[in-house]
């Protein structure tokens, strides 16, 4: 008995140590979380922390190098403060990414629920549209739409919202069909609850974790897509500025004033990388098959 009790008491601290290690957030994830939080704070407080107007020009201070006491990140070819434009670009790019991700999630989840509920013809139509969307290069579609209809902020956000909806539709459809076959959803339906109530109140909360992980995958992709469109001149238009817009304008001065292009390029790289790392960490935490 004494040997058994000693061995049991010795095993308890080991288990506790392993549990604490599992609960500890990795350093890389913590750094990614801090970076993304800083980006959100900058986007919210852009009007208060921006030192100059993004359209304010000073031809006497053209192409000032970073480190100047009045222009910490230097100036561009017409004397505009790079830091001020970078802060505004972060706000615009995050606004587009957040809006488009929410639209894509709502659209795909709704369509997926409709396919799971009605099945048959509706399901076949949804799956066909999802296959078509997945096979179509979205950048070419976006370029065609923006070139034909012109570009405005509302149109750009709505167009970006069409990106990746088929991913959410497939996830929502598959998980909704699986959840509907389980006892709790069938029991609520037999009690007389409406299908819309069953999907919103019982099925959606059970698949929310998977949708959140998918959103962390879509968000950086939309940032890169918007940056590509703005780089090509079909995204955000002057006087507004976005990260891709700044990279597009700065490429002409890459050899003489590389800071104009490198500052927004590094923000794009670190932001998309941090969200991808957070997405992988959330997937490991929320996916029951990995636990």
Where are these regions (language model features)?
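C-terminal transmembrane helix and the adjacent membrane-cytosol boundary/short C-terminal tail
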Residues: 163, 209-217, 258-291
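Generic hydrophobic transmembrane alpha-helix motif, especially the helices
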Residues: 72, 82, 108, 116-117, ...
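Short helix-to-coil transition segments within interhelical loops
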Residues: 75-80, 117-118, 133, 177, ...
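Glycine-rich helix-loop "coupling/hinge" segments at transmembrane-helix boundaries
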Residues: 145-148, 160, 175-176, 217, ...
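Lipid-exposed faces of alpha-helical membrane segments in multi-pass integral membrane proteins
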Residues: 31-45, 99, 103, 107, ...
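Transmembrane alpha-helix signature in integral membrane proteins
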Residues: 82-114
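Transmembrane alpha-helical segments of polytopic membrane transport and secretion proteins
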Residues: 1-37, 277-291
């Amino acid at each position: 008995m004494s040997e058994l009790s000693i061995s049991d008491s010795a095993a308890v601290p080991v288990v506790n140590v392993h549990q604490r290690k599992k609960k500890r957030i990795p350093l890389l994830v913590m750094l990614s979380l801090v970076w993304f939080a800083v980006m959100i704070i900058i986007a919210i407080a852009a009007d208060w922390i921006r030192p100059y107007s993004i359209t304010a020009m000073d031809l006497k201070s053209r192409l000032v190098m970073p480190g100047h006491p009045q222009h910490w990140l230097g100036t561009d070819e017409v004397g505009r403060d790079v830091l001020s434009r970078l802060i505004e670009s972060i706000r615009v790019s995050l606004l587009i990414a957040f809006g488009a991700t929410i639209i894509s999630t709502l659209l795909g989840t709704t369509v997926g629920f409709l396919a799971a509920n009605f099945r048959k013809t509706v399901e076949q139509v949804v799956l066909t549209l999802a296959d078509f969307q997945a096979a179509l290069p979205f950048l070419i579609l976006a370029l065609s739409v923006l070139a034909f209809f012109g570009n405005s902020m509302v149109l750009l956000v709505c167009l970006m919202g069409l990106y990746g909806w088929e991913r959410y539709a497939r996830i929502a459809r598959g998980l909704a069909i699986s959840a509907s076959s389980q006892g709790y959803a069938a029991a609520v339906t037999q009690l007389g609850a409406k299908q819309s109530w069953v999907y919103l109140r019982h099925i959606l909360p059970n698949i929310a974790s998977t949708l959140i992980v998918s959103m962390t995958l879509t968000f950086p992709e939309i940032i890169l897509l918007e940056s590509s469109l703005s780089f090509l001149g079909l995204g955000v238009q002057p006087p507004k500025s976005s990260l891709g817009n700044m990279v597009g304008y700065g490429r002409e001065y890459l050899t003489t004033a590389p800071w104009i292009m490198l500052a927004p390029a590094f923000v794009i790289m670190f932001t998309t990388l941090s969200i991808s790392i957070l997405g992988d960490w959330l997937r490991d935490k929320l996916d029951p098959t990995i636990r």
